[in-house]
Amino acid sequence: MASVLLALFLLSFVLGRYDVPLAQLLKILLSGIFPIEQTWTDNMAIAVLNVRLPRVLLACLVGCALSAAGTGYQTVFQNPMAAPDILGASSGACTGAALAILTGQSSVMITVFAFGFSLLSVALVYLVGSHARGSRVMNLLLAGIMVGSLFSACTSYIKLVADPTNQLPEITYWLMGSLSGTRMSTVTFAAVCMAVGLVPLLLLRWRMNLLTLSADEARAMGIHTDRLRLAVILSATVLTAAAVSVSGMIGWVGLVIPHLSRRIVGNDCRRLLPMACLFGAAFLLLVDNMARSLTATEIPIGILTAFVGAPFFIYLMVKGGDRL
């Protein structure tokens, strides 16, 4: 999978309206490390380093984050339909971004608002779920549905009162998900936030298999599953918040990719989580290449992931629903 990701990584730099030969591409990318004589034009360097490199890196980061978050949530809740938006993180991010656009904030503040509201949404879910009676897992799922619906209603109201000429189209486009106009500052923000969520998740993957045990079995082994579950939820939430805040709503990646990864390496989280990260990065990179190459006008990436992910998930259900 790493070789596939590398091939797609290089292919992404070649695709585009401005032609950059592969030989020149490699020289441009390596010129920052090695002293290479310049044989490329300044326009080639701008296209590769300022336009395509940030976008390619962000596609890899977002795909990796969403897939890792989906794997974490599916393991915690023991639910094959669990996705990164199960606790309302995506709905909260949408409300934050829509509010920032409505109030005329800069692109940086749109990302900050989306990230903050995403964390706020999950905090409310955990607050409600932990104080309700009954099963902790079921309470979190129900609270996620309710809080997500509340934030979705807030987003709908913001769209209703937004200026239909300028603000509403911008809100709508953000909600459809896109990686266009990515800057290195955005990539840096995403990388730092995602590292905060991904590193603990990778360190915990040896223990995540224990979440499949019953409460009595875990207690007999002296394992605090509540603490482990909370740590995984927090890590997956930070990953989801970071991904959605910089890319908008991109669905199906965190739902489909973990299932495909299980088909390849099995259910052991020690191998499953790294595979999901690589697979997710490669998948979103491929879809982003399609988004900017299929038509003259760029297609929002959230639309393409739905077109690709939904039919493929149906195929998985038909061919082996008992293995989902």
Predicted regions located by residue number:
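Alpha-helical transmembrane segments in inner-membrane proteins
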Residues: 1-324
